[in-house]
Amino acid sequence: IPPDQQRLIFAGKQLEDGRTLADYNIQKESTLHLVLRLRGGMQIFVKTLTGKTITLEVQSSDTVENVKSKIQDKEGIPPDQQRLIFAGKQLEDGLTLADYNIQKESTLHLVLRLRGGMQIFVKTLTGKTITLEVESSDTVENVKSKIQDKEGIPPDQQRLIFAGKQLEDGRTLADYNIQKESTLHLVLRLRGGMQIFVKTLTGKTITLEVESSDTVENVKSKIQDKEGIPPDQQRLIFAGKQLEDGRTLADYNIQKESTLHLVLRLRGGMQIFVKTLTGKTITLEVESSDTVENVKSKIQDKEGIPPDQQRLIFAGKQLEDGRTLADYNIQKESTLHLVLRLRGGMQIFVKTLTGKTITLEVESSDTVENVKSKIQDKEGIPPDQQRIIFAGKQLEDGRTLADYNIQKESTLHLVLRLRGGAF
């Protein structure tokens, strides 16, 4: 192939004869693309959004990047602000016109890539996700208009939530640090609100005017307005659940005249200790209102152990993720025990005095109390009537199987504690 008919392309760029491979950072095992320079070029048209049509002299072997350079030469628009569309497809810089079957007198469409333009997502309560083209400088009001264009929902019925905050119409996306591919939540503003009650630990009841679409954070602000309690010291409980700031009242099915309970998050937390099976003790800064799940996250931050592999024991009880330290009466300088939940458990046997043998699925990190519960599930014997013996020792409720070196297929002995008896 004669050199004058060859065009070499690398990384979307046509290579110039006088330059070296090093100039283009071409390294070993790089791949160049060879396209043939067709004798004689062709004309194509580029139509802009304003309706203006530009005529360009090109060759089938030109890359899209080359075409953008020609448009820059004619119109002064930088290539990185150009998007070229043909047959409904956005053209990629490194491909050639021939790759897209663009022939003489084809028409391309030029769309300008807005500086700061980006896509964001809007998720509705029904779970539907809408994609919007926006700019950081768009106001919340602009965004609501775009949603109206797509979904037909009037702006005055829309409330947009991001990071647990309701967005105000006059502010911009940049004001809220909303970046590309952020997800906003759309809740509908129900016409007419409702009253709910908030009961404090002192027994005082506060009445609030709210809407179903209010976030928990909004409710905390209303409580602050009435009572002067900062939101970060408030915990709201409904139906036994602690409410999360970013969720709405509707999410929790809180209806008119529902009663929420307000618990104060004590300023200034406390220290607790967590002791591992290796004997290492970790110190954590916590609050009484922290959930067990929060504590496991803090342990993960310090030790790198995933929460789902952690089991926390206090006073012989395994702690449940959704409960708070206060629920278990864990106070400052209490010591929790951390046992690792080994992936995949093991079988052990429990032999009764009648000679019957029960098989149980357990983990080394199970406490003796857990084992007694499993025996109760199988045999109906209340834990307080069970005594479990292994290697001649009576096992204590708060200890784990690992503490007693009970391994797979070990046999424990079950002795019944006689009601009213004393040993």
UniProtKB/Swiss-Prot annotation:
<dbReference type="GO" id="GO:0005737">
    <property type="term" value="C:cytoplasm"/>
</dbReference>
<feature type="propeptide">
    <location>
        <begin position="422"/>
        <end position="423"/>
    </location>
</feature>
<protein>
    <recommendedName>
        <fullName>Polyubiquitin</fullName>
    </recommendedName>
</protein>
<keyword id="KW-0677">Repeat</keyword>
<dbReference type="GO" id="GO:0003729">
    <property type="term" value="F:mRNA binding"/>
</dbReference>
<feature type="cross-link" description="Glycyl lysine isopeptide (Lys-Gly) (interchain with G-Cter in ubiquitin)">
    <location>
        <position position="89"/>
    </location>
</feature>
<feature type="domain" description="Ubiquitin-like 2">
    <location>
        <begin position="42"/>
        <end position="117"/>
    </location>
</feature>
<feature type="domain" description="Ubiquitin-like 3">
    <location>
        <begin position="118"/>
        <end position="193"/>
    </location>
</feature>
<feature type="domain" description="Ubiquitin-like 6">
    <location>
        <begin position="346"/>
        <end position="421"/>
    </location>
</feature>
<keyword id="KW-0832">Ubl conjugation</keyword>
<comment type="similarity">
    <text>Belongs to the ubiquitin family.</text>
</comment>
<keyword id="KW-0963">Cytoplasm</keyword>
<dbReference type="InterPro" id="IPR029071">
    <property type="entry name" value="Ubiquitin-like_domsf"/>
</dbReference>
<feature type="domain" description="Ubiquitin-like 4">
    <location>
        <begin position="194"/>
        <end position="269"/>
    </location>
</feature>
<dbReference type="InterPro" id="IPR000626">
    <property type="entry name" value="Ubiquitin-like_dom"/>
</dbReference>
<keyword id="KW-1017">Isopeptide bond</keyword>
<dbReference type="InterPro" id="IPR050158">
    <property type="entry name" value="Ubiquitin_ubiquitin-like"/>
</dbReference>
<feature type="domain" description="Ubiquitin-like 1">
    <location>
        <begin position="1"/>
        <end position="41"/>
    </location>
</feature>
<feature type="cross-link" description="Glycyl lysine isopeptide (Gly-Lys) (interchain with K-? in acceptor proteins)">
    <location>
        <position position="117"/>
    </location>
</feature>
<comment type="function">
    <text>Ubiquitin exists either covalently attached to another protein, or free (unanchored). When covalently bound, it is conjugated to target proteins via an isopeptide bond either as a monomer (monoubiquitin), a polymer linked via different Lys residues of the ubiquitin (polyubiquitin chains) or a linear polymer linked via the initiator Met of the ubiquitin (linear polyubiquitin chains).</text>
</comment>
<dbReference type="InterPro" id="IPR019954">
    <property type="entry name" value="Ubiquitin_CS"/>
</dbReference>
<keyword id="KW-0539">Nucleus</keyword>
<feature type="domain" description="Ubiquitin-like 5">
    <location>
        <begin position="270"/>
        <end position="345"/>
    </location>
</feature>
<dbReference type="GO" id="GO:0005634">
    <property type="term" value="C:nucleus"/>
</dbReference>
<dbReference type="InterPro" id="IPR019956">
    <property type="entry name" value="Ubiquitin_dom"/>
</dbReference>
<dbReference type="Pfam" id="PF00240">
    <property type="entry name" value="ubiquitin"/>
</dbReference>
